[in-house]
């Protein structure tokens, strides 16, 4: 049984992985404008690797969230986290160097609020 401190730490770690996962794509957007002195994941390792790292961070986020919420069987949160993961995963997997600024400004930015939206929807429906 997880104690409060461990739950809190895992929850913070989970959020960090989610935030990292959805911010790396902005480095992909900025690759045309970044100077070579700035070492970002897309500049150093390439766009493909950056996308894989971002998606891996999202997988880690989902694993931690499911682990934390299966113990208390918070079904609406598990479903919401899964939907947030799927939504963010899809948006990031569709990234390329030619996406418009609107793609980043709307679709990618909406990943950050998607968990709240899915939580509200699942709370109403379940």
Question: What kind of feature is each model-predicted range?
Answer:
Residues 2-3, 11, 15-18, 34, ...:
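Generic hydrophobic alpha-helical membrane-segment signal
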Residues 23-29, 90-98, 117-124:
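Juxtamembrane membrane-interface segments at transmembrane alpha-helix termini
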Residues 5-13, 49-52, 74-79, 99, ...:
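Structural motif marking the loop-to-transmembrane transition
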Residues 1-13, 63-77, 120-126:
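Helix-coil boundary and interhelical linker segments in multi-pass alpha-helical membrane proteins
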Residues 16-58:
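Solvent-exposed interhelical
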Residues 13, 17, 53-63, 82-86, ...:
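Lipid-exposed faces of alpha-helical membrane segments in multi-pass integral membrane proteins
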Residues 56-101:
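Transmembrane helix-loop-helix
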Residues 38-40, 44-51, 91-117:
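Interhelical loop and helix-boundary elements at the membrane-water interface
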């Amino acid at each position: 049984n997880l104690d409060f401190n461990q739950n809190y730490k895992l929850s913070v770690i989970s959020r960090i992985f989610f935030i990292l996962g959805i911010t790396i794509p902005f480095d992909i957007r900025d690759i045309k404008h970044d100077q070579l002195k700035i070492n970002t994941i897309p500049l150093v390792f390439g766009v493909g690797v950056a996308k894989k790292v971002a998606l891996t961070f999202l997988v880690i986020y989902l694993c931690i969230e499911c682990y934390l919420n299966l113990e208390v069987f918070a079904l609406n949160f598990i479903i919401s986290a899964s939907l947030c993961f799927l939504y963010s995963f899809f948006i990031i997997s569709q990234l390329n160097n030619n996406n418009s600024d609107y793609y980043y400004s709307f679709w990618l930015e909406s990943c950050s609020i998607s968990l709240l939206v899915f939580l509200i929807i699942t709370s109403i429906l379940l």
